[in-house]
Structure formats: C-alpha cells, structure tokens
Amino acid sequence: MIPQGTVSHRWRVSYRHAESMGAHWQQPGQSRTRLERTVCQHDAMPPEFVTSPGGPRVATARTKLLVSVGAAIVGGTAAAVAGAGRAAPLIGWDILALVFGGWVWSTVWRLDAESTTSDAMREDPSRDLADVVLLGAAMASLIAVGVVLIAAGHASGDLKYLQAAFGLASVFVSWTLVHTVFTLKYARLYYTGQPGGIDFNETDAPDYRDFAYLSFTIGMTFQVSDTNIQTKQIRRTALRHAWLSFPLGVVIIATTINLVAGLAG
C-alpha cells in the first residue's frame, strides 16, 4: 500500500502524459492534488476492485469475466437439462455476453470525461486477456449459430421460426459484445501511453460514449467517419476491429435473409 499523499512512479508517468493534454482533458477547478489522491486510492485497492472517482468500487475485467462465465455455465447447463439440445452452448454464450456487456455499460455509460480518464488509465493486467477471450469466443459463437440455423432448417412449425430468431439474436449479442470490447480498448489506448491519437473534432475530452461512437461506427461501416485516427497503434487496432466486424456483419445479413425467407415461405 502506498502512503497517503504519495504517488507511484507509473502513475506519475501517466499523470505527465495526461497533463500534457492540458485543457484538452482537465475540467475547471481540477487540481493535481485531487488526481494524485485518486491515484493513491487506486494503488491501495486490492486487485479485484478499484475505486472510481467519487463512486463505489469497480470490479476488474477479470472479475467481470469470471462472474459472466459462471452465469453462462449455470444457464447453459440448465438449458441442456431442460432439453435445449444443441442450442444449450449458444444459450450459455448469450448469457455470458449479456452479463458482461450489461455490467460494463452500467458502469461506464454515465462516466464523464474525468472519470473515463481515470478508469481507462487504471492498470488492470487482466484486461488484455479478457479481450482475447471475449473476442475469440464471439467469433467461435458463429459456429454455434450455424448449428442452430441448420437445425432450424429441419424444424417445422413455430419451432423453425423460433430457432431462426434465436440465431439472429445470438449474432446480434456477439456483435454488440465485440464493439463493447473495442470501445474499452480505444479508451485505454487514448488515455494511456502516448496520449491522444483520436481527433473527435472538439475541444472537450472524450468519454466512453464518444469511444462507443467510434467503435460502433467501425462495426457498422468498417471505417471511421468524422473522427481522425492519428497514431499507428490505434490505426492497427481499428484495422483488426474492422476485420473482425466483417464476418459478423455477413452472418447477420445471412441470418436475417434466412429468417425472412422462412417467414415468407
């Protein structure tokens, strides 16, 4: 634990990066002492939780992921016992994605720019691992969607439409989770290391909703719109993001066509 009134070296470095942006991120009346006091609270917290400025303790990415996986196992097992068959793994995945995504957005949606800065700068080694696990699982879930759609093709009556709609909803859940993960990643890249890197064409510092705008725009159009990416690291991240978004978009379109054709037939 770091004594009150002192700041670890890594946070001094991060502070200098943030300070270099000056009015670009600081709000009127904010002092260096206030930021240092907040940073000390971060350093003193146990690894599973940190304290957001002016708010309650915030769970780490690892905690969110573990809780979500636990909920998925329980839900998927219950679905299998209830007779869901091949759809049970996909039900488990949907529960994981909904729990993790809902937890994230309930935490970050109302954060202002200052709180977004603090949250994004928070050191959490489990974040990168959580990103890899979630993105990999989201892409793998497309296989489960294919299995459900094949089963829907051999089903009859209302069950056919129910399975097709379930497949479409599952792809949408995976699609949303992918862009949620990249929303958090863009915020981390912007506020840590080399500060900045994304020009939102305004003087106010960006919050998570601004990064969500960038992330979901890439997810829907495979390109940036009225924001300018200014660093190689963020540009390469955006390239990977667009590359992952394409198969998800294709599957959503294909699933929608399959559902509409089934309803028309």
Q: Where in the sequence are the language-model features?
A:
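The first (N-terminal) embedded transmembrane alpha-helix
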Residues: 59-79
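Short, hydrophobic transmembrane alpha-helix segments
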Residues: 76-90
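Loop-to-helix transition at the N-terminal end of transmembrane alpha-helices
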Residues: 86-102, 106
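Membrane-water interface of transmembrane alpha-helices
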Residues: 101-113, 180-192
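Juxtamembrane helix-capping/reentrant segments at transmembrane boundaries
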Residues: 116-136
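Membrane-proximal soluble regions of multi-pass membrane proteins
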Residues: 190-192, 196-228
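Pore domain of cation channels
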Residues: 210, 214-217, 227-264
